[in-house]
């Protein structure tokens, strides 16, 4: 798959369970070990590249999760463009929205942090706590 200037090899564990995708940037692969494990396309689970592309930000690996955040920046349309699975759940004010999106991995955290004070994560609680810790660590760099 091609994304953000690079080609990626996307793989799932060979047990047939598509729990989460693993991403490998093709230009960084140095060695491949061939195992004597054969498979046919009939044995592989269905894979929707388009859906994976919509849910993956910056090709960060990880499980699928639903996130909700408040956005008060200048362009909610830019958010909807960047996150193809995003939808406006509620309008909270003249320029404030509650947005929900499904994403794989922690790429969403990196993107949310890049949105400055325009974003407040409200769900899931684990991501809320991760954001608090990251913002506290960032602030400590300036003290």
What are the language-model segments listed below?
Residues 1-59, 63-68:
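Core beta-strand-centered patch of the WYL/Sm-like small regulatory domain
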Residues 52-143:
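Polybasic (Lys/Arg-rich)
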């Amino acid at each position: 798959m091609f994304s953000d200037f690079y080609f990626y090899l996307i793989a799932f564990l060979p047990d047939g369970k598509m729990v989460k995708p693993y991403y490998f940037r093709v230009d960084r692969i140095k060695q491949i070990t061939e195992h004597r494990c054969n498979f046919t396309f009939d044995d592989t689970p269905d894979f929707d590249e388009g859906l994976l592309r919509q849910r993956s930000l910056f090709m960060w690996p990880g499980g699928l999760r639903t996130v909700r955040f408040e956005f008060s920046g200048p362009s909610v349309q830019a958010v909807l463009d960047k996150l193809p699975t995003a939808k406006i759940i509620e309008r909270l004010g003249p320029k404030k929205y509650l947005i929900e999106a499904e994403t794989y991995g922690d790429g969403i955290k990196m993107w949310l942090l890049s949105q400055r004070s325009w974003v407040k994560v409200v769900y899931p609680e684990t991501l809320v706590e991760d954001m608090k810790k990251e913002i506290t660590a960032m602030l400590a760099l300036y003290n």
